[in-house]
Structures are given as C-alpha cells and as structure tokens.
C-alpha cells in the first residue's frame, strides 16, 4: 500500500507554495503523520523518507476504522490552524483494504460538510487496485 502512496506522490509538484500533502495513518486509531503546516516536509524527499520509516516500523493488517481517519482529517488536517489554505481545493484520497470495521460511524457523521470537495477511495486487495470516487459525505 505504501508503494501506491509513493507512486501517487511522485505525480504531484509538491512544495510549500505548490501541492501540499498530509498523511494520516489509521487502524483502531488515526494519527496525522504529516500536516500541511509542516512546510519542511512538503517535498518529495521528506515524504518518501516518511514512507520508508513507516514501511520499516508500521504494521499493516489491523482493524480498519476509516471513520476515525475521516474524523481526524476533518478535525486536524483540513483546518487553517494546521496549514490548510482556504483558496486551494481540498482533495482527499483514502487508501484502504475496503472493509471498514462494523462499529464504524457513517462517513457523513464524521467528516464535516464542505471540508473536501472530492474524495477518492483506492481499495487495494490481493494486489489489485480499484478506484472509486464518491461525493464528500457519502459512504462508498
């Protein structure tokens, strides 16, 4: 999954005054690994170093709580206090195994309206990717 994130990052012109990228990891909890306000990390080298560190240390395959990730994004990522730029469009791409936990809340309850204009969910399962886009607030 991290290699898919790395490939996606490679497609953008990343920088403090260009495309900014935030990384949130999640399982039974969600954690912001890079925020928009961390300008020193808004370059491909720094983001790739983060991915290398995650690959070496993080475990995949735990509980999937996509709702917690969306809630964290709404509360901690797409905020001006954390570096969100009001005049730039907000796009969120969620990498998931496609099966959020049965106790997950509906996405429309955890992601405030109009925080993001486009959500794309990339479901990776058995090394096959399937891209599904849906309007903000709708569950896949």
Language model features with spans:
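Extracellular/luminal ectodomains of metazoan preproproteins built from arrays
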Residues: 10, 15, 63-64, 140
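Von Willebrand factor
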Residues: 1-95, 100-105, 124, 128
